[in-house]
């Protein structure tokens, strides 16, 4: 899954307060830092897949990209993959502190490395975006969902996620959303015109389905496939309920 850069709603976007566009180095050679994912390279989640594809794509276009991973591992704290430099940042394993501690420390590190653009992924890690702004950095926030709506986040965590949302809406030079519903949300709640860039998939050569047939006994058109995280907000229970009501002989 990659993030395309060709879809926008409306056709152009500039903050009403006249925020600057980030040029000055002819774009090529520009230093970009990415903060918010858990690991790189990784396919553990949508954020990680998108960061991996976007970072590698920018490197191929001549940008210098640093991605900040969460957690320190002996001997693997700084490494380069596909031309992308990955730096691991200490953080606590406790879920309520993980993204918060990591995003602040990663921001401070990025500020010491003369990055031109700091790109935050998800609203939780975007709280220190305002610090990057104070240091004159061009900031981008890609909203990967309104995480405070997820049932597992309550109390302090939910309030912190809402804070990240407000910071991104008010201070990010560029605010990117992945769906029209989120575009409408930021327009209506914050009067903020975001950039709509839906996620996309890489087209690959189709492979024969022998393995699926041999391993699972499935034939084309004989099953319904759900691909996604098993969590309430993804609606798997709705899928199961609908499947039972359909009285179909297809496998789920």
Regions found by a protein language model. Give the residues of each.
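A short, charged, and often flexible helix/loop element on the N-terminal side
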Residues: 82-108, 151-157
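A structural motif in glycosyltransferase catalytic domains
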Residues: 51, 224, 239-240, 252
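Conserved donor-binding/catalytic core segment of Leloir-type glycosyltransferases
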Residues: 33, 218-234, 240-247
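N-terminal subdomain of nucleotide-sugar transferases
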Residues: 13, 21-72, 244-247
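Carbohydrate-associated surface elements
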Residues: 181, 200
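Membrane-proximal helix-turn-helix segments that form the acceptor-binding/catalytic region
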Residues: 108-111, 134, 158-175
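An aromatic- and histidine-rich active-site surface loop
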Residues: 100-111, 115-144, 148
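A short helix/loop element that forms part of the nucleotide-sugar donor recognition site in Leloir-type
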Residues: 206-218
């Amino acid at each position: 899954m990659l993030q395309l850069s060709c879809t926008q709603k409306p056709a152009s976007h500039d903050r009403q307060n006249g925020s600057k566009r980030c040029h000055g180095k002819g774009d090529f050679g520009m230093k970009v830092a990415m903060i918010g994912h858990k690991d790189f390279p990784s396919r553990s989640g949508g954020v990680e897949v998108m960061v991996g594809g976007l970072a590698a794509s920018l490197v191929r276009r001549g940008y210098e990209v640093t991605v900040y991973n969460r957690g320190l591992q002996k001997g693997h704290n700084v490494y380069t993959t596909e031309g992308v430099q990955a730096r691991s940042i200490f953080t606590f394993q406790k879920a309520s502190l993980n993204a918060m501690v990591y995003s602040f420390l990663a921001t401070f590190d990025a500020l010491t490395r003369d990055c031109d653009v700091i790109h935050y992924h998800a609203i939780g890690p975007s709280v220190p975006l305002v610090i990057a702004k104070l240091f004159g950095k061009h900031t981008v926030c890609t909203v990967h969902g309104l995480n405070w709506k997820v049932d597992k986040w309550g109390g302090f965590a939910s309030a912190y996620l809402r804070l990240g949302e407000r910071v991104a809406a008010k201070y990010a030079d560029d605010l990117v959303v992945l769906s029209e519903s989120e575009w409408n949300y930021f327009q209506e709640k914050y009067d903020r015109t975001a950039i709509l860039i839906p996620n996309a998939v890489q087209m690959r050569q189709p492979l024969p389905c022998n393995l699926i047939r041999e391993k699972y006994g499935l034939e084309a058109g004989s099953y319904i496939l759900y691909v996604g995280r098993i969590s309430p907000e993804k609606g798997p229970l709705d899928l199961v309920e609908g499947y039972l009501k359909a009285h179909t002989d297809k496998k789920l």
